[in-house]
Amino acid sequence: MNKQYSYPLDLSWSTEELASVLSFFNDVEAAYEGKVEAKKLLDSYKGFKAVVPSKSEEKRLGREFETVSGYSLYRAVQAAKEKGKGKISLGK
């Protein structure tokens, strides 16, 4: 996928909040481009949800991220929840 894209970020977030959201986006990318521990992705998702508690905002960011990257936040989280332990890979 094209690695020259911008993440959907809210510039009103603090540095720590930006780091949490970016960590989650990076873990989703890792799930598609290689492998990532399911627990690591779920932990970063918890950090993301602490910053973005609203389901509608999560969906909006997910759509924007998928549009620019081709990677689905939802599918990555669902795969991690189903796997529980071990690594997940969503790459083709």
Curated annotation (Swiss-Prot):
Superkingdom in the source lineage: Bacteria
Matches recorded under Gene3D superfamilies: BH2638-like
Pfam families assigned: UPF0223
Coiled-coil boundaries: none
NCBIfam families, A to Z: PRK04387.1
HAMAP family linked to this entry: UPF0223
Protein family (similarity comment): Belongs to the UPF0223 family.
Protein's UniProt name: UPF0223 protein SPCG_1392
Lineage of the species this protein comes from: Bacteria, Bacillati, Bacillota, Bacilli, Lactobacillales
